[in-house]
Amino acid sequence: MSKRIQAKHKLDRRMGQNIWGRPKSPVNRREYGPGQHGQRRKGKLSDFGTQLRAKQKLKGYYANITEKQFRRYYAEAIRLRGDSGENLIGLLERRLDAVIYRAKFVATPFAARQFVNHGHIKVNGQRVNIPSFLVKPGDVIEVKESSKQLEIVVVASQLAERDVPDYIEVDHGKMTARFTRVPTLSEVPYPVHMEPNQVIEFYSR
């Protein structure tokens, strides 16, 4: 088992939830944390513990964004007008790797990050290899012509359910997507309940 898969399994067990909705998640078989003490009954979390778990879960979902980068999203979320929690979700869903994953061009957030890193994506006709690049409403994202027959793309297009959210328009035949608008929390198809306002509270302490 690769270190990446082990890390994903560990986060699922720590949270006691199937963070990415994966069929092979260990919590589908057991609902306790990792390690020799994982089966102990868990007590009620403190406010800090609840906020920390909310942060770990949301940060982990987006392919384990670094703490430095995640804190920058928090700073931008509170700077913007409106609800800071909603702003945080909007920023995360604008990430190029998140859009690639939502469009079902690849099967997982981790694969999406690697796919962008390797230069397989164009935004408005220009190659972009930065997973954290923030797309804007109206931006057109496409898989490079030379990359459309890669196994990772072919397998995803054949096996992935085409439950693309409403804020992304996709043509799977041409492997193009258009980001139409910034979504709200209720529109994002998370497999588990996310609490961005708890994340805001964590960083606001």
From Swiss-Prot:
A Pfam family matched in the record: S4
HAMAP family, per the entry: Ribosomal_uS4_B
Family classification: Belongs to the universal ribosomal protein uS4 family.
Function of the molecule: One of the primary rRNA binding proteins, it binds directly to 16S rRNA where it nucleates assembly of the body of the 30S subunit.
Region of interest (Disordered), ranges: 1-49
SMART domains: Ribosomal_S4, S4
Protein name from the UniProt record: Small ribosomal subunit protein uS4
GO CC terms of this entry: small ribosomal subunit
Compositionally biased spans, kind Basic residues: 1-12
Keyword check for Transferase: no
PROSITE patterns per record: RIBOSOMAL_S4, S4
Gene Ontology molecular function: rRNA binding; structural constituent of ribosome
NCBIfam families found in the cross-reference section: PRK05327.1, rpsD_bact
